[in-house]
């Protein structure tokens, strides 16, 4: 969006900025409608409605690198007014849970406003990481221009890679997802340039036009790209009927099941927004359609895990605007699905079986001695873990240890011939350090984690953080 805004004529650029501001307002309206509450009573036991946000918005036109980056910061005051006139603090529990749903609301609203104003169409980027959620870009905007104006992100990613490499050298393992987040934050700060001298919008647009001409091969190519983006080929929007809603609700549920075992309304609402964008709908009833999909998924396709409310009916002063009790937390109900419960039952049944393949105890002891000779001595607990998992015959075993506890190393001394004879297959929930050396010790090629690139023919159920699953 920022690339097109930077090089389009002033009239079009103004409409793009208006669409952005309208999408920001839609996201704030979502927060006010669904996620903004305060707390009253002893220990804040009552969650109550408030009149709205008090906030200041600041729109920036570029990044620290000087690239076009139209974005708005919204500084929110922590005080809100309750319906009885008191000024109290925001209940951050719900606001935190709703962050991603608010972000997806902005994304959907932006596409909708740009299509209504300028006929702009979005599509999924073809070079995106298949392990991540798809990124949508404006049809007709040259990817080379987007890459040229992503200098800030490129510098962060480069530094993050360097920090991750250094982390692995220092700790003998790759960083966990949480640690990668901290490394990304560190990279963001370390690569943050000093603020450049202020430039007027006219000066910025002249500079951006020159840069775009260099990337695309001349000013005529820039004009042609803008024309293509503003006049995309038309696609037929699906007919919104009961069949479409049912199919979309099924897709929402499938996406939820692929990423989590339980969910709340915020997860459903965020995924519903993604499905509506992917369908390229032109309806002006997006909000109503999102609500309909959320209701379909939660009421007809999900199984509630939260115990039902008691039969006590509070008086009106103790109920929120939607009729719910002030003694409940909005959006806190947990749900799952039949498929998740069936998978859980299969795991439990498998965990009760002890007829799996085993390795001879003598072979396990010899492998441990071989590990000592090769400089990989294990302590008593680690050695016991290897013996137990190799010889127990249990169909499903779980090793729980702190992240970075070198769980994969415990399996490294497993006897080569024993594993080969037993036909065992090791599966790591996360990419282990030095996978090839472990595989060589086991006498077989390395397998792949579901979170790592590479071929894989099996799926591993979600495991607790800091755990390694072994199925026989």
Q: Predicted segments — roles?
A:
Residues 1-472:
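Helicase P-loop NTPase motor core of nucleic-acid translocases
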């Amino acid at each position: 969006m920022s690339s097109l805004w930077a090089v389009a004529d002033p009239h079009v650029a103004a409409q793009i900025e208006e669409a952005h501001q309208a999408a920001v307002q839609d996201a704030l309206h979502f927060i006010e409608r669904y996620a903004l509450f305060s707390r009253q009573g002893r220990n804040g036991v009552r969650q109550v409605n408030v009149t709205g946000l008090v906030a200041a918005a600041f729109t920036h036109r570029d990044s620290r690198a000087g690239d076009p980056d139209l974005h708005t910061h919204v500084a929110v005051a922590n005080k809100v007014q309750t319906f009885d006139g008191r000024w109290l603090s925001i209940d951050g529990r719900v606001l935190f849970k709703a962050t991603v749903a608010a972000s997806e609301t902005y994304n959907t609203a932006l596409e909708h406003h740009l299509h209504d104003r300028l006929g702009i169409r979005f599509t999924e980027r073809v070079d995106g990481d298949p392990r991540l959620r798809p990124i949508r870009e404006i049809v007709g905007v040259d990817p080379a221009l987007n890459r040229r104006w992503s200098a800030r992100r490129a510098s962060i990613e480069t530094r993050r890679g360097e920090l991750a490499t250094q982390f692995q050298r220092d700790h003998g393992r790759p960083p966990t997802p949480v640690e990668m987040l901290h490394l990304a934050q560190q990279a963001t700060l370390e690569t943050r340039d000093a603020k450049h001298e202020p430039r007027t919008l006219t000066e910025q647009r002249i500079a951006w036009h020159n840069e775009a001409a260099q990337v695309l091969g001349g000013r005529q190519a820039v004009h042609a790209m803008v024309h293509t983006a503003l006049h995309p080929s038309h696609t037929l929007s699906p007919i919104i009927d009961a069949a479409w809603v049912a199919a979309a609700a099924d897709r929402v549920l499938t996406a939820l099941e692929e990423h989590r075992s339980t969910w709340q309304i915020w997860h459903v609402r965020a995924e519903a927004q993604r499905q509506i964008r992917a369908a390229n709908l032109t309806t002006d009833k997006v909000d109503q359609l999102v609500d309909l999909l959320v209701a379909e998924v939660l009421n007809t396709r999900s199984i509630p895990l939260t115990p039902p409310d008691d039969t006590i009916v509070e008086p009106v002063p103790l109920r929120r605007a939607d009729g719910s009790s002030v003694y409940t937390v909005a959006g806190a109900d947990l749900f799952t699905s039949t498929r998740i419960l069936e998978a859980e039952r299969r795991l439990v049944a498998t965990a009760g079986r002890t007829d799996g393949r085993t390795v001879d105890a003598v072979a396990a002891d010899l492998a441990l001695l071989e590990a000592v000779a090769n400089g990989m001595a294990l302590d008593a607990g680690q050695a016991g873990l290897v013996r137990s998992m190799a010889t127990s015959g249990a169909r499903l075993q779980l090793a729980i240890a702190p992240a970075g506890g070198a769980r994969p190393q415990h399996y490294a001394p497993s006897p080569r011939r024993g594993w080969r004879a037993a036909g065992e297959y090791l599966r790591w929930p996360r990419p282990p350090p030095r996978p090839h050396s472990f595989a060589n010790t086991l006498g077989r090629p390395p397998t792949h984690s579901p979170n790592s690139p590479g071929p894989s023919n099996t799926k591993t159920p979600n495991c607790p953080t800091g755990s390694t699953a072994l199925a026989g």
